[in-house]
A protein has these predicted regions:
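Short glycine/serine-rich loop segments
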Residues: 1-57, 265-275, 288-291
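Short, well-ordered beta-strand elements within core beta-sheets of diverse protein domains
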Residues: 35-42, 192-198, 293-296
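Short amphipathic alpha-helices in soluble, non-transmembrane regions
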Residues: 307-308
């Protein structure tokens, strides 16, 4: 078994648990309200096995005060006993997650093709609209800039937990030389965070309240649907490499979180599984993996794991090369 613990989502099978299910102890915080840590693995079963191990309040991190008792979850065992069918499952296709202008047509097609395969497993599929989904990136960006700047400047307070004092000692105080050597995204957080705090006092609280509103909207949907689906990222992975200008360094990541940032805000669990290939933007002869994001209600990891595991059991994503001409 090959697994690692990551923050947010990445390539492979990535699982972002409900906020607070996994303690954040020992991980550098961006914003305690949106901090999530979870497994990155080769399969859904491996991710579930890792989640069983790392879940539960550790007696240190107050984010996890509402979590389960360590060692009490049985996500992996439930998958191993499952018959890999989804009879009675209701799947909602979030149209805002597919129809955003940033979503590449190849990615949209590949994920929509994968979603339709849930029908073969016994699930019913419906389109659902949630306009508030589109507010997620703006809410998350503001929170990350303000809270991130406070953290980077050593001004984060108000948590019961383990503070990373060794890291703070190495980073602080900021000097001009240290700031110039920082990655452009770090400079972006500090400059924009300070600007927002100075020009828009009280803005962080407004975004926090708006985030609760969006979370409630999603919870209402989960009274009707077992899972919601959409592309994980709007495009396949951009070309990696050093870029000369700061803006060029930031540009490849712009817009990548249009479907993921909102669930950092709301705290809902989300699973990303690979469902095929689509051509790279820089070279359409290069085919790169496409991820489908499966989202569940708060503390409903079992449902998203079950859906991901069933899809994996019946379909081989490595053979699925999406072509607009053929679909």
């Amino acid at each position: 078994m090959y697994v690692c613990v990551r923050t947010d989502l990445g390539l492979g099978v990535g699982l972002k648990p409900t906020h607070g299910r996994v303690p954040f102890t020992g991980i550098s915080s961006g914003d305690a309200m949106t901090d999530h840590a979870g497994p990155l693995a080769r399969t859904t079963l491996e991710a579930a096995t890792c989640l069983d191990v790392i879940s539960g309040y550790d007696g240190i991190d107050d984010r996890a005060l509402g979590g389960s008792k360590p060692g009490s979850t049985r996500f992996a065992a439930a998958l191993q006993q499952d018959h890999n069918q989804l009879d009675g499952f209701k799947v909602g296709i979030v149209v805002e997650g597919f129809d955003h202008s940033a979503v590449d047509p190849y990615v949209k097609g590949a994920v929509m093709t994968a979603v339709q395969k849930f029908k073969e497993l016994g699930a019913t599929i419906e389109e659902v609209s949630l306009p508030e989904h589109l507010h997620g990136p703006a809410i998350w960006t503001i929170q990350q800039r303000i809270a991130g700047a406070q953290t980077l400047l050593g001004q984060n307070t108000g948590r019961r937990g383990l503070y990373m004092t060794e890291m703070e000692h190495a980073r602080l105080p900021w000097t001009d030389d240290g700031f110039q050597r920082a990655f452009p995204s770090t400079k972006n957080v500090i400059i924009n965070g300070l600007y927002l705090m100075q020009r828009f006092p009280g803005l962080y609280g407004k975004t926090a309240n708006t985030g609760r509103f969006v979370s409630d909207k999603y919870e209402a949907l989960f009274e009707k649907y077992d899972i919601l689906v959409m592309p994980t990222t709007p495009v396949v992975a951009p070309r990696h490499g050093k870029r000369e200008l700061p803006l060029d360094s930031l540009r490849p990541s712009m817009g990548l979180t249009i479907n993921t940032a909102v669930f950092n805000v709301t705290g809902h669990p989300a699973l990303s599984i690979p469902v095929g290939f689509a051509p790279a933007k820089e070279d359409n002869q290069v085919m790169l993996p496409v991820g489908m994001q499966i989202v569940g209600g708060l503390w409903q990891e079992e449902k998203i794991l079950r859906a991901g595991h069933a899809w994996e059991a019946h379909f081989d994503w490595k053979t699925m090369h999406y072509s607009i001409d053929k679909n």
